[in-house]
């Protein structure tokens, strides 16, 4: 029989029919020893790595980056998974590594399925009792009954779901009624479990939303602080611009004066005999030198406001902005032109003060009335004041010499007055009167010397209410008359007798000879004319008999009378649709001007002394240390002012609020002790 081995000793590829020879035990042990890892190859590989590392980090080439690299390599080699992979690699011979054939999909699967130990170590510990699959199931909507029935029919005809056969086998041994109950129990248990998962998800969403709200509130506070800083910088820049304008005007005046004092050129004089004859008829040159040149009546320009200040609109409602100790006695009237603008206050201490709401300081005083001012109005830079001396005075605040930043209050005063008294003026005209004395400091007397315009004198008793719009001003007096004034000509153009109008209304409404009053009897302690407002030819007037009369100034007749108040009307204001009135009967009434009926009404515990509204809120002073605020949008009543949070029985901690004014959510209130408070409403 031919040998089954080739000449080179390799087994023949042909199949042999002879039995295989028995392998001796020595050769079997030798083959097993060949399967063990070859340590000599590993030792040689280790020596090569050691030599390479020694050449790289020798004493002559040691660097920080090499040490960092070796440190990172040492940390990587200490990982258990890397050590296991090295040991598994050591157990295989190079032949097996070379001969091993790994498919491309298997390599991709290993690359995608391998997760590093760092990533596994960073997995957060979760105490959630529900799995991810349960959370996914909870997000699925509940199927209607019809879909379930269709699904059952389809599953019965088609391929059953995984686990469906086991459930059917389990329920098949039970009676039909028990099967139905068991399936119903299983379904309800599953729904109950899903409800628990959904509740947990809702709680997690609530916590997440709370965290977002907290972060948003923090961001809002940061942006609000940045907005406040921008508005302060904007105001400072506007004041700097005003100072530069004043310096330019001063320099221009100096240049004009220098040009006027310079000797004229000979060529510039006319040489005609006619001009010489005319010049001889005039005064000599020495007379002209004695006459002082006419000073230019140059008023102070108003501060430029590139944009309206909106900080108060983003503050929390009821936030205190500032407080000014304005007067020594009760506030009788006040008004301001715009938020952070100019405020004018009047008091029983017979003073009228002008305030810069942005800086919180007194600009000056309006002097001229012989008695206390009972009413006033501010419209842009024009101020109208009505006094107990039966006169009405108008003022133009744009003529005031006021520089809020550098205290240069009078540019036309002497140098000694401006320089020597600078510190004294700064102390007198300082901020918020932080001294211990109760008396407010008097501002410089020359600051308002060009402010008065003219005086209206026609009433014979004290002025209790005024209002002007455009060129028309209407005043109400204790002499029981209303007077219409033309501000262009400065004279009275019409007188309206309130008593005559009341008598005419009584005679018209009385069908028989018996007298029936249209309102209540007059209150002797209240003002006969409590409040008025004019717009074009329409005039609204509230009097002490509780009546609100709507006049037509073109005919001088009462167009409509609104009956409802049982006490003197103390405040009123109207817009395009509604008229709001406040009365001593403790009520606030909102009237519909189209129908003359009451649209809404509410009352307080004390008489209403002052009231005003803007686009959203109605604010009132009702004999308390807080301002009563009514939100027209949601119908909510709330309090704003110094008395918020104080005990109801403690009325001595804060003074009673007498007057309120509001514009665009910027609230100013005046108290009985002379203090003025500014709030965000």
UniProtKB/Swiss-Prot annotation:
It is found in: Mitochondrion outer membrane. Involved in mitochondrial fission. Acts as an adapter protein required to form mitochondrial fission complexes. Formation of these complexes is required to promote constriction and fission of the mitochondrial compartment at a late step in mitochondrial division. It holds the Pfam family WD40. One of its GO terms (biological process) is mitochondrial fission. The lineage of its organism: Eukaryota, Fungi, Dikarya, Ascomycota, Pezizomycotina. It comes from the Eukaryota. This is Mitochondrial division protein 1. Residues 416-431 have a biased composition (Acidic residues). Residues 211-263 form a coiled coil. Keywords: Coiled coil, Membrane, Mitochondrion, Mitochondrion outer membrane, Repeat, WD repeat. WD repeats lie at residues 326-367, 369-405, 458-497, 505-561, 564-603, 605-640, 647-681. The keyword Repeat applies. Residues 270-279 have a biased composition (Polar residues). Residues 1-25, 146-171, 259-279, 406-449 are annotated as: Disordered. It is a peripheral membrane protein. The keyword Repeat applies. Belongs to the WD repeat MDV1/CAF4 family.
């Amino acid at each position: 029989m031919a040998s089954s081995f080739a000449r080179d000793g390799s087994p023949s590829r042909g199949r042999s029919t002879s039995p295989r020879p028995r392998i001796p035990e020595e050769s079997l042990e030798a083959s097993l020893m060949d399967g063990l890892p070859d340590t000599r190859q590993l030792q040689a590989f280790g020596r090569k790595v050691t030599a390479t590392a020694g050449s790289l980090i020798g004493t002559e080439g040691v660097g920080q980056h090499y040490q960092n690299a070796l440190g990172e390599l040492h940390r990587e080699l200490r990982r258990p998974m890397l050590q296991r992979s090295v040991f598994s690699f050591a157990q295989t011979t190079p032949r097996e590594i070379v001969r091993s054939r790994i498919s491309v999909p298997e390599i991709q699967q290993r690359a995608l399925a391998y997760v590093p130990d760092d990533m596994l170590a960073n997995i957060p510990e979760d105490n959630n009792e529900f799995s991810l699959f349960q959370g996914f199931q909870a997000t699925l909507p509940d199927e209607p009954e019809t879909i379930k029935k269709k699904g059952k029919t389809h599953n019965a005809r088609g391929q059953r779901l995984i686990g469906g056969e086991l459930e059917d086998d389990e329920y098949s041994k039970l009676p039909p009624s028990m099967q139905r109950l068991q399936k119903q129990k299983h379904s309800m248990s599953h729904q109950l479990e899903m409800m628990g998962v959904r509740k947990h998800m809702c709680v997690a969403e609530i916590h997440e939303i709370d965290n977002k709200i907290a972060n948003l509130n923090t961001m809002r506070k940061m942006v609000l602080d940045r907005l406040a800083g921008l508005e302060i910088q904007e105001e400072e820049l506007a004041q700097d611009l005003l100072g530069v304008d004043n310096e330019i005007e001063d320099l221009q005046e100096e240049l004009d004066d220098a040009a006027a004092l310079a000797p004229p050129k000979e060529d510039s004089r006319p040489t005609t005999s006619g001009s010489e004859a005319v010049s001889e008829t005039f005064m000599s040159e020495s007379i002209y030198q004695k006459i002082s040149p006419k000073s230019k009546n140059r008023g102070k320009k108003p501060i430029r406001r590139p944009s309206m200040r909106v900080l108060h609109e983003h503050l929390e409602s009821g936030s205190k902005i500032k407080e000014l100790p304005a007067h020594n006695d009760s506030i009788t009237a006040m008004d301001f032109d715009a938020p952070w603008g100019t405020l004018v206050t009047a008091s029983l201490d017979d003073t009228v003060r002008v305030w810069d709401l942005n800086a919180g300081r007194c600009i000056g005083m309006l002097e001229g009335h012989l008695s206390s001012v009972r009413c006033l109005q501010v419209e842009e830079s024009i101020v109208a004041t009505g006094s107990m001396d039966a006169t009405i005075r108008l003022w133009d605040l744009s003529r005031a010499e006021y520089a809020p930043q550098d205290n240069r209050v009078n540019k036309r005063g002497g140098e000694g007055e401006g320089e020597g008294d600078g510190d004294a003026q700064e102390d007198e005209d300082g901020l918020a009167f932080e001294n211990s004395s109760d008396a407010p400091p008097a501002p410089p007397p020359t600051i308002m010397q060009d402010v008065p315009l003219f005086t209206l004198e026609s009433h014979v008793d004290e002025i209790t209410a005024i209002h002007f719009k455009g060129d028309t001003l209407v005043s109400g007096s204790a002499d029981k008359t209303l007077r219409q004034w033309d501000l262009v000509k400065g004279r009275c153009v019409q007188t309206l007798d309130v008593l005559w109008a009341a008598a005419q209304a009584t005679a018209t409404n009385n069908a028989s000879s018996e007298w029936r009053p249209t309102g209540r009897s007059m209150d002797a302690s209240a003002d006969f004319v409590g409040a008025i407002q004019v717009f074009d030819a329409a005039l609204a007037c509230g009097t002490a008999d509780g009546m609100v009369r709507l006049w037509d100034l073109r005919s001088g007749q009462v167009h409509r009378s609104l009956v409802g108040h049982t006490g003197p009307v103390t405040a009123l204001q109207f817009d395009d649709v509604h008229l709001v009135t406040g009365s001593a009967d403790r009520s606030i009434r909102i009237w519909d001007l189209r129908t003359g009926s009451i649209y809404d009404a509410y009352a307080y515990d004390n008489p209403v002394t002052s009231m005003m509204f803007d686009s959203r809120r109605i604010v009132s002073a009702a004999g308390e240390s807080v301002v009563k605020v009514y939100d027209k949008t949601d119908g909510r009543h709330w309090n704003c002012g110094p008395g918020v949070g104080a005990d109801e029985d403690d009325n001595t901690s804060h003074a009673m609020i007498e007057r309120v004014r509001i514009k665009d959510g910027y609230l100013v209130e005046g108290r009985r002790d002379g203090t003025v408070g500014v709030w965000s409403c």
